[in-house]
Structures are given as structure tokens and as C-alpha cells.
């Protein structure tokens, strides 16, 4: 049930559940179809929201959250 902290190396062949935080995903350079330099990263609020929605079902969610199942919607047109 562990997870990888931000900016640490992750496995590009595994899903984003390996990265801690609801909005963190395994970001890789794609070099001729080969993933390399993969690190747990966060994008902007829009990216974070879609990543979070996918990560709601991670079996190891307890590693970074107390099982809360909510994602913060991105601010659209400055209305938050």
C-alpha cells in the first residue's frame, strides 16, 4: 500500500496509483515509443481533476488519503 512521492522515479508501465496524491500521475518522456525518465508529477488543475477521477478506485488510496472519494473541480472561467 505504499506510493511514490512527487518528483521521484515511477514505472511507466504501471498505472498512476503508484504515485502519491490524488492529482499525481506517472509522467514519462516518450522516446520512439519507449517511455523513459518517468517521474511522479502533477499537471494543472484540469489535468489534476481527470487524474483524480481515475485514481478514485486505486486499491492503495489509503497510502495518501483517508479514503475520501472526491476530486476538486478545476476553476472554469474563474468561478470556483
Swiss-Prot record:
GO MF terms, alphabetically ordered: calcium channel regulator activity; toxin activity
Keywords: Calcium channel impairing toxin, Disulfide bond, Ion channel impairing toxin, Knottin, Neurotoxin, Secreted, Toxin, Voltage-gated calcium channel impairing toxin
Tissues and organs where the protein is expressed, per its UniProt entry: Expressed by the venom gland.
Main location: secreted
Domain of life: Eukaryota
An example Gene Ontology CC term for this record: extracellular region
Pfam families in alphabetical order: Toxin_34
InterPro entries the UniProt entry points to: Omega-agatoxin_II/III_CS (IPR005853), Toxin_34 (IPR013605)
Cysteines paired by S-S bonds: 3-20, 10-26, 17-52, 19-40, 28-38, 58-71, 75-80
Intracellular or extracellular location(s): Secreted
Function: Omega-agatoxin are antagonists of voltage-gated calcium channels (Cav). Induces rapid general flaccid paralysis followed by death when injected into the cerebral ventricle of mice at dose levels of 3 ug per mouse.
UniProt record similarity statement: Belongs to the neurotoxin 04 (omega-agtx) family. 03 (type II/III omega-agtx) subfamily.
UniProt domain comment: The presence of a 'disulfide through disulfide knot' structurally defines this protein as a knottin.
Protein name from the UniProt record: U20-ctenitoxin-Pn1a
Lineage per the UniProt record: Eukaryota, Metazoa, Ecdysozoa, Arthropoda, Chelicerata
